[in-house]
From Swiss-Prot:
Record SUPFAM superfamilies: MurCD N-terminal domain, MurD-like peptide ligases, catalytic domain, MurD-like peptide ligases, peptide-binding domain
GO biological process entries: cell division; cell wall organization; peptidoglycan biosynthetic process; regulation of cell shape
Top EC group: ligase
Gene (UniProt): murC
Primary role: Cell wall formation.
Protein name: UDP-N-acetylmuramate--L-alanine ligase
Catalyzed reaction equations: UDP-N-acetyl-alpha-D-muramate + L-alanine + ATP = UDP-N-acetyl-alpha-D-muramoyl-L-alanine + ADP + phosphate + H(+)
GO molecular function: ATP binding; UDP-N-acetylmuramate-L-alanine ligase activity
Disulfide bonds: none
One term under GO cellular component: cytoplasm
EC number: 6.3.2.8
Keyword Coiled coil part of the UniProt annotation: no
Record-stated family: Belongs to the MurCDEF family.
């Protein structure tokens, strides 16, 4: 039976994906959000899903309400209205925990690599059997006859605790979200609690010291490059066309694989997917075939060429992610200068990881920094500025503004890697406009 869903904060990555999924399952879906453009809204608009400004008038008692986690009674008129009139609503993660019970569910958790791995697992599985999925880049798909459900499992504020998947991958554990987690031990405890809720099998990166401590009532399979793991990637060849490798399980090769993706981390992501699908009983020849056609996810090493200039857009906003992204750029473009344009995301993360950010950015040949993008949850107390990061980077590092990105033109034979979780795409757009204008002026 069709329902009407109203999403409070529909432009959020998870919310927009869930809205698309429910829409494709035949439900009526609408939502509200701020006017500012987010990359997630294009998919919503293409699907014909109405996006409204926040207003009490959007809500009626016959709707099922799903509210984004950032929206509360004191900062959102719709949440306040629902509470005042005792209209029930669920948070995204609460709704998802109930929704997935009707499927064989496969979760992907981890400090880094969740979205890429969820995208890869969804891509391969949907080509073998009817599958619904939610990806953290705002992509959602609802198959009417789906038996399987693939989803991204987010650790922030322990949002993954309502989830009890049959299978789950955990890519890694790292200290992030210092506005919530008190330290690495706190992060570990959250993931360990989640692991205890997995029912059939857990797949974890075996060379992560923290993950080796994880416990679960479900069997734990370790994957990685070392022979101490249950699933081992070996005979690895990294080229400008992607990565080729074999995987063995208990000493026996189970297949040869190619992923059209770059960087050591993407070999690990693919190995996790292979391990999960092997244990779930899928044909490895089919898995290998469908891995070859994976085209990536939004804002994860997304490439374009403007005026013969290569531009890469990536969501990397943690030192570990920056290193992985720059490693991928070097693999694909070994003979080009790698230029990093990075915008730190949140003051708390920048303060907590300042030296780690500097170390990560040293992997580029030159570095340009945008002013710190503060979260809506925090206030700039002046404790840290982007110039503090620039001073710590050993490579040439300059601070740029969105109104003047012309210093980026000082490089020949370069690849420009824009990274960040704030509004770094505004800087990218400014650079693209600058390149386009140069083309016009030269004609």
């Amino acid at each position: 039976m069709s329902k009407t869903y109203h999403f409070i904060g529909i432009k959020g990555a998870g919310m927009s994906a869930l809205a698309l999924l429910l829409h494709q399952m035949g439900h009526k879906v609408q939502g509200s959000d701020v006017e500012k453009y987010y990359f997630t809204q294009r998919g919503l608009e293409q699907a014909g899903i109405t996006i409204l400004p926040f207003s009490e008038d959007n809500i009626s008692p016959d709707m099922e309400l799903i509210a984004g986690n950032a929206f509360r009674e004191d900062n959102n008129s719709e949440v306040a209205y629902a509470m005042r009139h005792q209209l029930p609503f669920k948070r995204y993660h609460e709704f998802l925990g109930e929704f997935m019970k009707q499927f064989t569910s496969l979760g992907v958790a981890g400090a880094h690599g969740k979205t890429s791995t969820t995208g890869l697992l969804s891509h391969v599985l949907k080509h073998m059997t009817a599958t619904s999925y939610l990806i953290g880049d705002g992509t959602g798909h609802g198959a009417a006859d789906a038996r399987y459900f693939v989803f991204e499992s987010d650790e922030y504020e322990r949002h993954f605790m309502p989830y009890h998947p049959e299978y789950s991958i955990i890519t890694n554990i790292d200290f992030d979200h210092p506005d919530y987690f008190t330290g690495l031990d706190d992060v570990f405890n959250a993931f360990n609690d989640y692991a205890k809720q997995v029912k059939k099998a857990l797949f974890v990166y075996g060379e992560d010291e923290e993950l080796r401590k994880i416990s679960s009532p479900a069997p734990i399979y370790y994957y990685g490059f070392e022979d101490t793991n249950d699933f081992v990637a070996f005979d690895i060849t990294r080229t400008t066309n992607g990565s080729d490798f074999k995987v063995k399980h208990k000493g026996h090769a189970i297949g040869q694989f190619h992923v059209p993706a770059y960087g050591r981390h993407n070999i690990l992501n693919a190995t996790a997917v292979i391990a999960n699908l092997f244990i779930a009983g899928f044909d490895m020849k089919l898995v290998a075939e469908h891995l070859k056609s994976f085209s990536g996810v939004k804002r994860r090493f997304t490439e374009k060429v403007i005026n013969d200039t290569i531009i890469i857009d990536d969501f990397a906003h943690h030192p570990t992610e920056i290193i992985a992204t720059l490693d991928a750029a070097r693999q694909k473009y070994p003979n080009k200068e790698i230029i990093a344009i990075f915008q730190p995301h949140t003051f708390t993360r920048t303060i907590a990881l300042l030296d780690d950010f500097a170390h990560a950015l040293n992997e580029a040949d030159s570095v340009y920094l945008a002013p710190i993008y503060g979260s809506a949850r925090e206030v700039d107390k002046g404790d840290v500025k982007v110039e503090d990061l620039a001073a710590r980077v050993e490579r040439p590092a300059k601070v740029i503004s969105v109104d003047n990105v012309s210093p980026l033109l000082d490089h020949d034979n370069a690849v420009y890697v824009f990274m960040g979780a704030g509004d770094i795409q505004l800087y990218e757009r400014s650079f693209e406009e600058l390149l386009a204008n140069l083309t016009k002026n030269n004609q």
